[in-house]
């Protein structure tokens, strides 16, 4: 079975790994500068590094249908810079999974494939997809909805270690992001962790950096 996954962030990559292990052929699409923050567990870095590995599965950047077909035959996961899915749809997937996690539908329709699945808020089962997967933390996480929609985006991050929105470090201004630390680093309160253009970004508490944008992302 041929499965196209829109998005190659951490949630999309978890889906891709599971389907790949089940023997399905998986292709993923991304934008030119991915917004993934949990980059060590995602296939999106293949867009700018050429290759990304998650749980022993190799994701490779592909720029043509021919490269994509070869990668699939080698049991790799092709990652395409194809935001509109024009190239990917030429592959004629049996299943389309929209796992962009944009909190809204960016153009997926129920006619895109025999089976269309929406992941997270912004989709309505039976209208723009066949089913929706709940992504909100809690008892319904991962539940498949055959009617209605996932819980709307609250704008508040899930609670981890007693912190919700407090665990997010935000830029103080616009500009191209440059990280000054790495995922896995222990940072202290007041430490410089990045720059948004000429605007410094400081940690407002001591923490473990477990998610971080790729350098060159434009902060606005």
Predicted feature locations:
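Well-ordered secondary-structure scaffolds
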Residues: 1-220
């Amino acid at each position: 079975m041929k499965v196209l996954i829109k998005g190659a962030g951490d949630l999309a990559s978890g889906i891709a790994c599971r389907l790949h292990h089940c023997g399905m052929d998986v292709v993923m699409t991304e934008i030119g500068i991915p917004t993934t923050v949990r980059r060590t567990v995602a296939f999106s870095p293949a867009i700018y590094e050429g290759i990304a590995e998650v749980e022993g599965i190799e994701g490779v950047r592909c720029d043509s249908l021919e490269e994509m077909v070869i990668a699939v035959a080698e049991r790799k996961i092709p990652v395409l810079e194809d935001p509109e899915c024009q190239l990917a749809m030429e592959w004629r997937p049996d299943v389309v999974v929209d796992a962009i996690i944009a909190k809204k539908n960016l153009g997926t329709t129920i006619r895109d494939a025999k089976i269309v699945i929406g992941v997270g808020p912004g989709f309505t089962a039976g209208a723009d997809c066949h089913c929706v997967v709940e992504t909100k933390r809690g008892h319904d996480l991962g539940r498949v909805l055959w009617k209605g929609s996932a819980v709307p985006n609250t704008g508040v991050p899930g609670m981890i270690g007693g912190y919700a929105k407090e665990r997010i470090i935000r830029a103080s201004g616009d500009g191209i992001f440059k990280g000054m630390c790495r995922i896995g680093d222990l940072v202290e309160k007041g430490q410089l962790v990045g720059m948004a253009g000429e605007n410094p970004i400081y940690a407002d508490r001591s923490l473990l950096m477990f998610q971080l944008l790729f350098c060159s992302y434009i902060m606005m």
